[in-house]
From Swiss-Prot:
It comes from the Bacteria. It catalyses: 2 reduced [2Fe-2S]-[ferredoxin] + NADP(+) + H(+) = 2 oxidized [2Fe-2S]-[ferredoxin] + NADPH. Residues 340-359 are annotated as: Disordered. It comes from Ralstonia nicotianae (strain ATCC BAA-1114 / GMI1000) (Ralstonia solanacearum). Its cofactor is FAD. Coiled coil: none annotated. This is Ferredoxin--NADP reductase. Homodimer. Keywords: FAD, Flavoprotein, NADP, Oxidoreductase. Residues 341-352 have a biased composition (Polar residues).
Amino acid sequence: MTAETAFSAAPLPPVEQRIDVLIVGAGPVGLFAAFEAGVLGLSCVLVDVLDRPGGQCTELYPEKPIYDIPALVSCTAQELVDRLLAQCAPFGYPILCGRRAETVETIEGEHGRRFRVTTSVGDVFDCAAVLITAGNGAFAPQRVALPEAAALEGRHLHYAVRDTARFAGKHVVVAGGGDSALDWALALRKTAARVTLVHRREGFRAADASVAGMRAAVAAGEMDFQVGMIGRLDSAPDGTLTGIALRQREGETRLPCDELIALYGLVSEPGPIASWDVEMRAGRIVVETTAYETSRAGVFAAGDIALYPNKQKLILSGFHEVAMALRRAYRYANPDKTLVHTHTSNDTNLQSRLHAAAE
């Protein structure tokens, strides 16, 4: 199973839903948390600011080898994400990407305290607990640092590709030197009138296969590659993008450009989490270590964003943290029930569900 088959890549309209747990962050730790929620019978939704699940593993180093996941001798970061997506898929929990959790409001009702969480696209979740698995915080794209860029953002300047159809028949410039830049340049050459990849140097921080594919496409005349830095964005009187000025060793070169896709990578920022009334230190959330609960009861943190004595920033540590956090969250979601520990090997209902999904 790939990331593309485990969630909807198409933009989804805002939702309003009552659930047991909202998981903020769909990286490896958040994905395993979804599986654990399913094992415990908790309803949940995952939200992530990025346009696909996987967090840093998918966005920053998908080809990086990982050697310290139990029972896996080695796998790439993307392979780990794909396996985790396959593991939690039988429970059918929504993974809502391209939205950021903005506010967490406490609501008191006849059945006790719950939370009302809103997102950047207008989702509203009524939940018993919130589990923050946001890695190093919310990611934001590294923007084009030119004064004329802001007016073009969302119209002709893009930091992600959400709809390839909008580039049909256009002169497209893709700027960047990572996997995303090369992969999208290669993909769009079949749709756009012409694609030019721009990078500040000849070397790339991308998979060898992607680099080889790009160079082969350039050699075949299917796309162009230019070394240089974007120095200016040119617009028509009506505000449409017409071209870019490229600063090169030999001087300035102007490239025709209807749409610019800048894929310079991501920068980490705390985002709205800093205003959620949880104790933070150096950009991380302080938790206790019996259930990885924050200073705000019912709000938990796990993975790289969690801070406690002798904390190790390891994926496997995050797996343990969410397992413990969700068992405490179960109490908030089911105050009148006692969670009875059952080994998954003895849980016939769970086995039936997993086997049915595999068939």
